[in-house]
Regions:
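ATP-binding N-lobe of GHMP and related small-molecule kinases
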Residues: 1-115
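DPxDG-like acidic metal-binding loop motif
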Residues: 118-120
């Protein structure tokens, strides 16, 4: 499965009532812009994303981190955290608490800068 999560600009934000868990509900309007990451999940190491050409343009350095549960490859904009703190890996761990999943091969070509207010 390949997806292209778009960057987005927040056009409006309204903080509403406080919830019992201490967080607040939000009303917001997002506008997608034509900048996106490329994300691929597979159960097969032979898929295009895990070949040298993969989802990564030629010449882009690719980092790889593997455990018994997943192989995570990333290239493009540097992800400034250990793989275990990456939201993709945290989400995968939460899903694995409820579902038996095979070893997953995850590739991320990061193009949306983190912390830039673009949803990256």
């Amino acid at each position: 499965m390949i997806c292209h999560p778009n960057a987005k600009i927040n056009l409006g934000l309204n903080v509403t009532e406080r919830r019992p868990d201490g967080y607040h509900n939000l009303e917001t309007v997002f506008y997608p812009i034509p900048l996106c990451d490329t994300l691929q999940f597979s159960t097969d190491a032979g898929t295009d994303s895990h070949r040298p050409e993969g989802i990564f343009p030629n010449g882009i350095p690719v980092q790889e981190h593997s455990t018994e549960d997943y192989t995570f490859r990333s290239g493009g904009i540097d992800i400034d955290c250990p793989p275990e703190q990456n939201l993709l890996i945290k989400g995968l761990r939460l899903i694995r608490e409820h579902y038996a999943l095979p070893h997953l091969y995850i590739s991320l070509h990061k193009q949306i800068p983190s912390g830039a207010g673009l949803g990256g």
